[in-house]
From Swiss-Prot:
This is Transcriptional activator Myb. The modification N6-acetyllysine is found at K471, K480. The gene is MYB. The lineage of its organism: Eukaryota, Metazoa, Chordata, Craniata, Vertebrata. Residues 336-368 are annotated as: Disordered. Residues 35-86, 87-142, 143-193 form the HTH myb-type domain. Gene3D superfamilies: Homeodomain-like (1.10.10.60). It comes from Homo sapiens (Human). One of its GO terms (biological process) is calcium ion transport.
Length: 640
């Protein structure tokens, strides 16, 4: 069963048994004929009479049987109609003192919500009656005094704005219930307002000049911690509490004569304490009720901006100028300067502190120290930039859009280098406000040590890359013969000298190199004098090392390790450009030529060759069996 939402702590419109139980109100909607209608329609006189007869005949034990005789009602509806309206045992008269005392005791025991349980202890009363009796009469928080003119004015203004939403109006008047406000309006106030003009002339005449000038000056409230000698104007200065005084700035040109330094300008909607904010909002809404919607929108916008600023990191304390429109000329008042001097501006920011703030924590309220709620600015320049509330709203919208669109790009430029090969460990972007490039130094980044230095791709691609086999071969070569030596460069005939050296080395080692006149050298051909007929698929550079001009040269090493084996690269020439500017300048690295082996290779004996080459009878038999076994399977595609 649907419940009505709670509107007020004094509302009489909520109960877990709440249902439309109007006593014999037969003027409502009639159920449609021809189908079973289960909606909330008023009971007719005929239905009530029929329900009474059915209860007399069948009792109150089985409501489903009774509901079968009422085509448009459910068993729950029949039960509620009987228990709350038609039951002759119900007491509908006034409450006695004993009943009131019993309700008070039960509320203290069960609380002001379990009205069904409370009603079981009161014969003849239902939960709705107990609830209304408590909220309208027995609750000690309910005011029973006569209505004051201030309460009438609040009801009048709220009714103009909200209409007959009594639960909402009751929230503005603590101690008054929605039912009491409704009865007071219908019985007394409506006639006085509509016929006698009650509160209409007095409300316009009683509005102070502060409210009018307040609307002209864009909802700005000034707060100041004045020096002992400074005195605030006595007129138009309502005191909110005993600690801080809030006053209204009437005209921008008279600020310097009234306001001491420094001045904290607060946005009224969020930062002014609740009594002052309610009074200001009430004056603001007197002339234009539509402006309340804009005020609420600005509240949400301010709160969303503040939430986004909550995650901002601590920025370096620097004097810098804000780039936001409307704040570009504001300045911080310095305690060490005269009244006319000013320091550079401070932006809105989380944990952003300046040395010009007072050291005494009691000199400023919590709201003035709260981030994104106030700006500590000089007294003369802020009013020249912030003219009205709509301009301030546009500024906040600009900030909101700037945060959503520009922060990612700014942060990526500042936090991430353009070329990195190592991922950042544990890096987390917590800043949502835009950075200025002059504020964050790259040397101060927390993840600098985890970054690979950015290298230009053109430099990487200009030099030749050594394949992996050459790397292994070079490593073995350095172990045996030591590091490679670079030939000295002659300043005038470098290319000619290198060509002579390379030609001489190529004649000895069998490597032929060709050069281009206007380009980098390219290794064109490696001439192999002796090619092994038995090794076609092995790793040429890593495992087999050979050279020689005759058949007496040993081609394979049998017992010596790789480090002791000869290598083809012992007489090779590596060439690379010396710089990007000189394409024809070469670097040549040479290694002395290998010494020939002491003993030549011996031919294999006739008994050794069949055993070593797999020509024995057992070996050939096993090989043929293996081939038959493999050939028995059909070829298939290897799925990776």
């Amino acid at each position: 069963m649907a419940r009505r939402p709670r509107h007020s702590i004094y509302s009489s419109d909520e109960d877990d048994e709440d249902f439309e139980m109007c006593d014999h109100d037969y003027d409502g909607l009639l159920p449609k004929s021809g189908k079973r209608h289960l909606g909330k329609t008023r009971w007719t006189r005929e239905e009530d009479e029929k329900l009474k007869k059915l209860v007399e005949q069948n009792g109150t034990d089985d409501w489903k049987v009774i509901a079968n005789y009422l085509p448009n009602r459910t068993d729950v509806q029949c039960q509620h109609r009987w228990q709350k309206v038609l039951n002759p045992e119900l007491i509908k008269g006034p409450w006695t003192k004993e009943e009131d005392q019993r309700v008070i005791e039960l509320v203290q025991k069960y609380g002001p919500k379990r009205w069904s349980v409370i009603a079981k202890h009161l014969k003849g009363r239902i939960g709705k009656q107990c609830r209304e009796r408590w909220h309208n009469h027995l609750n000690p928080e309910v005011k029973k005094t006569s209505w004051t003119e201030e309460e009438d004015r609040i009801i009048y203004q709220a009714h103009k704005r909200l209409g007959n939403r009594w639960a909402e109006i009751a929230k503005l008047l603590p101690g008054r219930t929605d039912n009491a406000i409704k009865n007071h309006w219908n019985s007394t106030m409506r006639r006085k307002v509509e016929q006698e003009g009650y509160l209409q002339e007095s409300s316009k005449a009683s509005q102070p000049a502060v409210a009018t000038s307040f609307q002209k000056n864009s909802h700005l409230m000034g707060f100041a911690q004045a020096p002992p000698t400074a005195q605030l104007p006595a007129t138009g200065q309502p005191t909110v509490n005993n600690d801080y005084s809030y006053y209204h700035i009437s005209e921008a040109q008279n600020v310097s004569s009234h306001v001491p330094y420094p001045v904290a300008l607060h946005v009224n909607i969020v930062n002014v304490p609740q009594p002052a904010a309610a009074a200001i909002q009430r004056h603001y809404n007197d002339e234009d009720p539509e402006k309340e919607k804009r005020i609420k929108e600005l509240e949400l916008l301010l709160m969303s901006t503040e939430n986004e600023l909550k995650g901002q990191q601590v920025l370096p304390t620097q004097n810098h100028t804000c780039s936001y429109p409307g704040w570009h000329s504001t300045t911080i008042a310095d305690h060490t300067r005269p009244h006319g001097d000013s320091a550079p501006v401070s932006c809105l920011g989380e944990h952003h502190s300046t040395p010009s703030l007072p050291a005494d924590p009691g000199s400023l309220p919590e709201e003035s120290a709260s981030p994104a709620r106030c700006m500590i600015v000089h007294q003369g320049t802020i009013l020249d930039n912030v003219k009205n509330l709509l301009e301030f709203a546009e500024t906040l919208q600009f900030i909101d859009s700037f945060l959503n669109t520009s922060s990612n790009h700014e942060n990526s430029d500042l936090e991430m280098p353009s070329l990195t090969s190592t991922p950042l460990i544990g890096h987390k972007l917590t800043v949502t406000t835009p950075f200025h490039r002059d504020q964050t130094v790259k040397t101060q980044k927390e993840n600098t040590v985890f970054r690979t230095p950015a290298i230009k791709r053109s430099i990487l691609e200009s030099s030749p890359r050594t394949p992996t086999p050459f790397k292994h071969a070079l490593a073995a070569q350095e172990i045996k013969y030591g590091p490679l030596k670079m030939l000295p460069q002659t300043p005038s005939h470098l290319v000619e000298d290198l060509q002579d050296v390379i030609k001489q080395e190529s004649d000895e080692s069998g490597i032929v190199a060709e050069f281009q006149e206007n380009g980098p050298p390219l290794l064109k051909k490696i001439k192999q004098e002796v090619e092994s007929p038995t090794d076609k698929s092995g790793n040429f550079f890593c495992s087999h090392h050979w050279e020689g001009d005759s058949l007496n040269t040993q081609l394979f090493t049998q017992t010596s390790p790789v480090a002791d084996a000869p290598n083809i690269l012992t007489s090779s020439v590596l060439m690379a450009p010396a710089s990007e500017d000189e394409d024809n300048v070469l670097k040549a690295f040479t290694v002395p030529k290998n010494r020939s082996l002491a003993s030549p290779l011996q031919p294999c004996s006739s008994t050794w060759e069949p055993a070593s080459c797999g020509k024995m009878e057992e070996q050939m038999t096993s090989s043929s069996q293996a081939r038959k076994y493999v050939n028995a399977f059909s070829a298939r595609t290897l799925v990776m």
